[in-house]
Amino acid sequence: MAMLSSRRVAAPAKASAIRRSRVMPVVRAAAASSEVPDMNKRNIMNLILAGGAGLPITTLALGYGAFFVPPSSGGGGGGQAAKDALGNDIKAGEWLKTHLAGDRSLSQGLKGDPTYLIVTADSTIEKYGLNAVCTHLGCVVPWVAAENKFKCPCHGSQYNAEGKVVRGPAPLSLALAHCDVAESGLVTFSTWTETDFRTGLEPWWA
């Protein structure tokens, strides 16, 4: 009798162990499957973030890419033809149709540097252009028409409407370039080697 009862006790224990062993894999499988949506969401978010981050980079690249195209061969009068944002040679007549008196807009100048073309009060092309590269650390300085000055967004340097430095840390004024209109109508730049009319000093860039 004692042996029989021990067999009866052992049987339920063995059955219970079998049931536990069958249940455990199911629990693990459920846990694993519950992680799948999280991973999918994470991957989707990564793609969205990567795509979103690429937009401003692409925009900036398109905006400044025009200033890295090879310079034009020249304007026929010894100068180098100025180019617009699309890389086309600038013709004074066409430019003045869309750029009014007092306008200062970027073009591609000597050595491919971004250079401001200036429209005078009587709606002609100014006799000089301004290199837009800040003399502090080389940022491109935007023209702020509302304040009638150039203001560097990198470290706060400021230049007046003629490109003369009026606030540091930039140590020097923006470089000048001669700007002329050739007989063909092309706007051309050439190196400024004379005295800087803004400071009365020799040009630091020559």
UniProtKB/Swiss-Prot annotation:
Q: Where does [2Fe-2S] cluster bind?
A: 134, 136, 152, 155
What's a single GO CC term here?
Answer: chloroplast thylakoid membrane
* Cystines in this chain: 139-154
Membrane-topology annotation of the record: Single-pass membrane protein
Cofactor note text: Binds 1 [2Fe-2S] cluster per subunit.
Extract the Gene3D superfamilies matched here.
Rieske [2Fe-2S] iron-sulphur domain, Single helix bin
Where does this protein reside within or beyond the cell?
Plastid, Chloroplast thylakoid membrane
Native species? Chlamydomonas reinhardtii (Chlamydomonas smithii)
Q: What class of enzyme is it?
A: translocase
Q: Which reaction does it catalyse?
A: 2 oxidized [plastocyanin] + a plastoquinol + 2 H(+)(in) = 2 reduced [plastocyanin] + a plastoquinone + 4 H(+)(out)
Q: What is this protein called?
A: Cytochrome b6-f complex iron-sulfur subunit, chloroplastic
* Transmembrane annotation, as ranges: 39-68
Single GO MF descriptor: 2 iron, 2 sulfur cluster binding
